[in-house]
Amino acid sequence: MENLILPKQYKSELNLHDTQLAIKTVKDFFQALLAQRLHLTRVSAPLFVDPATGLNDNLNGYERPVTFGIKEQDDKNAEVVHSLAKWKRYALKKYGFQVGEGIYTDMNAIRRDESTDNIHSIFVDQWDWEKIIHKEDRNLDYLKETVRTVYKCLRKTEQYMAIQYDYIDLILPKEIFFITSQELEDLFPDNTPKEREYYITKAKGAVCIMQIGDTLESGEPHDGRAPDYDDWALNADILVYYPVLDIALELSSMGIRVDKTALISQLDKAGCPERKDLPFQKSIIDGTLPYTIGGGIGQSRICMFFLRKAHIGEVQSSLWPEETIAACDSVICFFFRRLLKLNTI
């Protein structure tokens, strides 16, 4: 609630019915284009996993997964996924995909410890994708090439939506700007990571921040990253400036995945070297899993961005604090109030 933004004179251009149609338009166009450009095949994915496998995403290391016991299996624990970052790499091998081929899936997750605001919800929906690469592709040039491909899909989607809806103006720049987290800290040494993201994104329009997770010269990382999927030297976030809320909006987090050397190093840095003995992590060390690149792209985030919405609750159904509902009820338009209240009826 403390980070809730109530933009002045905000008015949703679409009612509830038309918003649902527009959401489908965004999702259908973008995912088809992404699959074509990255050579991805859609697959089904799990909602929950066995915690003993090490397949769940540990995010920043402190978020609690939703856990439940399975009656038929003597109350054996299962965890609702935080993301499918690790599962996808395992699936590529299991399903027999080859170099240059990949998968994408609709990922639904519950993040119970999320602090909600205009762009954060306890319900997370994203396209999770993963692609097999050659070992020699594990470099910044290949990462940048893939980022440019994803960004072109975002620009094409904005252009398509601007044709469908006359209130949508084109705001994404032609090219995305690349910068490492250390270079960004050097530019704004006296600011927080979030402030740095805001300043660079407002200046450039669309930014790819690379090399996130390791400690910077200041002694702090730009942001937290789990140590066992992204290689911290070869990952990236795609952010765009969003004028509706005057913020830097992250649309995608992606990266080239860890090899044996990066995994062992990052587990040691994160203070959890024992995780190398879990089945997933062990398969990386043993070299039985393919080299991959992958990421997640927020479905509600891009719908919110392309439809110029002020709150993620306008494009997804979730649960919100009562004070959030009350604050929006008196400031933001009627449609927004109704949608936030759907789950209280």
Where are these regions (language model features)?
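Class II aminoacyl-tRNA synthetase-like tRNA-binding/catalytic domains
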Residues: E2-H120, D128-I132
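Generic recognition of stable, solvent-exposed alpha-helical segments in well-folded globular domains
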Residues: L21, T25, F29, R138-E145, ...
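Generic structural hydrophobic/aromatic packing signal, biased to beta-strands
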Residues: K24-V26, F30-L34, F68, V80, ...
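A generic secondary-structure signal for well-formed alpha-helical elements
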Residues: L34-T41, V150-M161, A310
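N-terminal pre-domains immediately preceding structured catalytic cores
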Residues: A52-D57, G61, I171-I179, P321
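A general structural signal for short secondary-structure junctions and capping/turn motifs
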Residues: F68-K71, K93-Q98, I119-S121, D169, ...
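Extended, charged alpha-beta segments that form solvent-exposed binding/catalytic grooves
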Residues: T105-P193
